[in-house]
Curated annotation (Swiss-Prot):
It holds the Pfam family OAR. A motif (OAR) lies at residues 304-317. It comes from Oryzias latipes. GO terms for molecular function: DNA-binding transcription factor activity, RNA polymerase II-specific; RNA polymerase II cis-regulatory region sequence-specific DNA binding. The lineage of its organism: Eukaryota, Metazoa, Chordata, Craniata, Vertebrata. Residues 52-61 have a biased composition (Basic and acidic residues). This is Retinal homeobox protein Rx2.
Length: 327
């Protein structure tokens, strides 16, 4: 395969394209009249594919080196884009507006759908609007006077469920609507039920056998602090655990050795003949207390109620005598 020297020498330093070399090689081959091994033949292009090698403009004129080769005999059209449809054609705009896609009914339907979707999703905006609407319809609270509350409480004590006539009469009396009176009775009954339930639960807690186990033990410091505190003389018992039994006048073996230092009251049922040999001390209205008989042992006196009462009376008399002696 041999290339002609004319074809190889056509590429100069200016860097012209393959198209210029192809044109000049074609002209050289045609002038020589021999077989020309051109670039098209080497590359395998045929005559049918020859127009693909040339740049064709809008009007079919070949383009060489990026420029159009205009035929001087062919007139250039003044509007090269005249064959394209006008973008501002009014007929097309009318066709779009006449379609049902942008009609007012469709727009309203779309807006309704968006509202329904917002409500279904529970958007904060819709919730705020609903709350705002509810606040508008809220009724003002009724402020009762002292007289009204007093009359209502009196009626509630008489009957927890007054009838319509009683409520109307009470409403006229306290200058309130009958509906307000009815609502007040409903609230008062609910409060009464709650109070009853609380009282019942409190009673059950007190009666529970497990309550004693749940009580916390008393700290030892409480007993230590409470013991050294002094008491009043009339609150202290004259008979202590350290007092020997033979020093108590009522428990002596013989009634003759009893000294008349204690007075008696009129409510003590003393048998006759037991107060002989005793002289009253202190105020003249009081007499000496009779001694207890030996036939009543200490255990029987503590167990019987009469003996316990006598013991308490005796202790009271002794404490009173001590206070008079200090005076």
């Amino acid at each position: 395969m041999h290339l002609s020297m004319d074809t190889l020498g056509m590429v100069d330093d200016s860097g012209h394209g393959i198209v210029d070399s192809y044109d000049m090689a074609k002209g050289a081959g045609s002038s020589n009249g021999g077989r020309v091994h051109s670039i098209d033949v080497i590359l395998g292009f045929t005559k049918d594919q020859e127009p693909l090698l040339h740049s064709v403009g809008d009007d079919g004129s070949p383009k060489v080196n990026g420029a159009l080769q205009q035929d001087p005999a062919k007139p250039v059209p003044s509007e090269p884009y005249g064959n394209l449809p006008e973008l501002g054609d009014s007929s097309q705009h009318h066709s779009y507006h006449d379609s049902s896609l942008f009609s007012s009914d469709k727009c309203e339907e779309m807006s309704n759908l968006t509202k329904e979707v917002d409500i279904a999703d529970g958007s904060p905006k819709s919730i705020k609007e609903e709350e705002h609407g509810k606040k508008k319809h809220r009724r003002n609270r009724t402020t009762f006077t002292t007289y009204q509350l007093h009359e209502l409480e009196r009626a509630f004590e008489k009957s927890h469920y007054p009838d319509v006539y009683s409520r109307e009469e009470l409403a006229t009396k306290v200058n309130l609507p009958e509906v307000r009176v009815q609502v007040w009775f409903q609230n008062r009954r609910a409060k009464w039920r709650r109070q009853e339930k609380m009282d019942t639960s409190t009673m059950k807690l007190h009666d529970s056998p497990m309550l004693s186990f749940n009580r916390p033990p008393m700290p030892p410091s409480v007993g230590q602090v409470a013991n050294p505190m002094p008491l009043d003389p009339w609150l202290t018992s004259p008979i202590s655990s350290a007092t020997p039994m033979h020093t108590i006048p009522g428990f002596m073996s013989s009634p003759q050795t009893l000294q008349p230092t204690y007075s008696s009251h009129s409510f003590l049922n003393s048998p006759p003949g037991m107060v002989q040999g005793m002289q009253p001390m202190g105020p003249p209205a009081y007499q000496c207390a009779p001694p207890f008989n030996d036939k009543y042992p200490v255990e029987d006196d503590r167990n019987s109620s009469i003996a316990a009462l006598r013991m308490k009376a005796k202790e009271h008399i002794q404490s009173m005598d001590k206070t008079w002696q200090h005076m």
